[in-house]
Amino acid sequence: MVVRRFSRVLAAVFFLLAGTVGLYLHRRTVMAADMSHMAGHMYMTPLRPMQPSDQQKADAVAAAAKQAMAPYQDYKKALADGYEIFLPNVPQHIYHFTKHEYGFEAAFHFDPSKPTSLLYKKTPDGSYKLVGAMYTDRVRASEDELNERVPLSIARWHQHINFCKAPEGRKAEYFGPDAKFGLLGSITTEEACAAHGGKFYPHIFGWMVHVYPYETDPKKIWSVDDDDQDHDNMSHSAMPGMQMKD
């Protein structure tokens, strides 16, 4: 019952984001003006100093992810086992196949053999190629807890934040160089959102971290994206308005 309720909540959030998050994830299609706004909608954990056991711990999680991914080279097997594609009809660089049951469990307990999402790339023939996995934690988890799961000296967990839902009649303002709403918009505060008649969400989803265990470059194994080209400047200290509210 609790898992079903959690799934319904996730479905409601997915509906809220439909039509905006897909474009966000497909960053190569976004104009430079929009990119400057994205920093106000993502919080990334700062890198911590490396501790003696951090690399070993991170390597163990990556190995567990690789083993968990092994049965799902064929995306149809993932679908058959309860993974659902997030926004399958929206063009994206990476497609998240999410198992809500694992997402619920991850809010209370970390099991690296049960990644919340499998990450696929669309292939030219319309199929999907498995490239990575995603682990999650609840919104209110502390950075110390995240560090216990995957060390913050190696991986940077992230949250999507400061989402202003557009009022009826203004949904076109989710997009374009003058976007105001959503994950690409210029609005990053509750006050500004209210002034434009929107509904403000301090954060959407919870904590996330991506792992790409097939990568040979250690820097790419724990990158936010498999090419990780747009998050380099999104540091903990360089982003105004990024503190989380509960």
What is the predicted role of each segment?
Residues 2-10:
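Bacterial N-terminal signal peptides that target proteins for export
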Residues 34-246:
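Primary mode marks residue(s) on the alpha4-beta5-alpha5 output face of response regulator receiver
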Residues 19-22, 241:
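Residue-identity detector for glycine
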Residues 9-12, 32-36:
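Composition-driven recognition of long, C-terminal low-complexity regions enriched in serine/threonine
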